[in-house]
Amino acid sequence: MIERSMVKSYLHYVVPATIAFTLTCIYSIVDGIFVGNIVGDTGLAGINVAYPLYALVLATGTGIGMGGAVISSIREGSGNREGARHATGHTILMLLLFSIPVTLLLLFFARPLCAVLGGAGETLNQAVLYLSVLSLAAPLQVMIVGCLPLIRNRGHVKYAMVASVVSGVINVIFDYVFVVALNWGTMGAGAATALAQCCSFLLIAAFFLRKNERLGLRHFKPNTELFAHSLKLGLAPFGLTLLPEITVVTLNVNALIYGGETAVAAYAVISYVAYVIQMLIQGVADGSQPLVSQCYGAGKLKLVQKIRNTNFVVAISIGLIGLGVMTALRYQIPSWFGASEAATEIVAFALPVIAFAYMFFGLTHVSTSYFYATDDARGSSLLVYGEAALVVLYTCGLGFVYGLTGVWGAIGMTQITLAFVAAVLLRRHSHKRLGLTSVHKGHKAAAHRHIAAAGR
C-alpha cells in the first residue's frame, strides 16, 4: 500500500478518472432507460446488438491513445520531455488515420454486421437505426477517446473529467428531446450521442490549442518505431474496450438459443448495470496509469509496486460492494428499464450470479492496466485476449451442459481462471522486470536498461 504522503497524488489521478468513467457509463444507462421505456424490449435488444460495432470505434481510439500516452508518460518520467511531446503528436496523427476505415465500416456495413452479431427481425432494424446516425460522428469519437488518455497523462486529469461529464450531460438532455419528446426511438438515442460527441470534441481541440499544450509540426513527424511501439502497447487497451463485446455477443447468441429474445432483453439490462462496476474498477486501474508510468520511467520501482497493491485493494472492494448492491436490488433494477415480467425474473436470477465475477474482475483488470503501464505489452495482451477466448469456451461449454444457468455462470468461471493466470504473471513480472524480489544488482540493472530503452 502507498504511504500517506502519496495519497494526495494517488487520489489526484484516480478520483477524476473514476468519476469520468462511471458517469460515462451512467449516461449510457440513461440511453437504455429512455429506449427501454419508450421503445420496449426490442429497442433495448437492438442497442445491445449494435453496441459491439460502436465499441470498435471506442476501442480504436482507446488503444491508440493509451499506447501513445504510456510512451509519453514513461519518457516524461525519464526526463525526455521533447520525446514525450513527440509521442503525443504522433498519437494524434495515428488517431486521425485510423478513424477513416472504422467510420467507413459503420457507414456501409452496419446491417450485415448486426445480423452476424445476433440481430434479427425488429431487433436488427432497431440496431441499424441506432448506428445510422451514430456512425456520422465516429471520427470525432475516435479522436475524443484517444486524446483523453493523452490529457490525463499530461497531468490535466480534471480537464479530461470535465470533457467527459459535459458530453454526458448533453447526451442525457438530447436523449430526452429526441427519444421521449420527438419519439425518434433508437435513432434518437444515436443522434443524442453524436451531438454530445461534437461538443466534447470542441473541448478536446481547445485543450491542444492552449499555449502551454500546443504542439509543433515536428511533433507530428511519422516514426515507424514509435508507430509500432504504440500499437504494441495499445493492443491491451484496445482489447479491454472491444473484447468485452465478445462477451456480449457470445452471451447474446447463447441466451437466444437457451432462453429466446426475452433472455437477450434480460441480458441487455444486466450488461448495463454490470458496466457500472466495470467502469469503477477500470477508472481505478487506468486512472493511476499516468502515475505508474511516470514512476516506472523515473526508476521508482518499489513505489510502482505500492501503487499496484493499493489498486488491488480498492478494485476488489468495489467488486464486493457491487455484488451486495446488485443482489439487494435484483428485482428493482429491471423495472428501471421497463423490462417485461418474464425478463425481470431472468434478471433477478442472473444478476447475482454475474456480479459474483466482479470480485475477481478487480484483480485481473488492475493487473492488465499495470502491465501496459509498465511497458509490458505481452502480459497485458495475454490477459485481455485470454479472457475473450475463455468467455467463448466457458459460455458455449457450460451453456450446452446447463442451459441458460450455465451461460450466466460462465462469466464467473472466466474471471476465476484469469485471476490465477494474473497471479502467475505478476510473480514473473516482479522477478524479471522490476527486480523487486531480488537484491542482485543484475536484476535492477536490467529493469533500468528496459526503462531507458522505453524512453528513447
Regions from the language model: what does each represent?
Residues 12-31, 133, 144, 167, ...:
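Transmembrane helical elements of multi-pass membrane transporters/channels
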Residues 65, 133-152, 160-171, 189-202, ...:
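Short runs within selected transmembrane alpha-helices of multi-pass transporters and secretion channels
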Residues 17, 21, 33, 70, ...:
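Transmembrane alpha-helix boundary and packing residues in multipass membrane permease domains
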Residues 44-104, 141-160, 266-329, 361-375, ...:
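Small-residue-rich hydrophobic transmembrane alpha-helices
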Residues 26-45, 114-121, 177-184, 245-276, ...:
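Helix-terminus/linker motif at the lipid-water interface of multi-pass membrane proteins
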Residues 56-59, 103, 171-176, 201-205, ...:
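Hydrophobic transmembrane alpha-helices of multi-pass small-molecule transporters
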Residues 2-38, 52-67, 71, 96-103, ...:
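N-terminal transmembrane alpha-helices
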Residues 1-17, 72-139, 181-235, 292-357, ...:
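Short alpha-helical transmembrane segments in multi-pass integral membrane proteins
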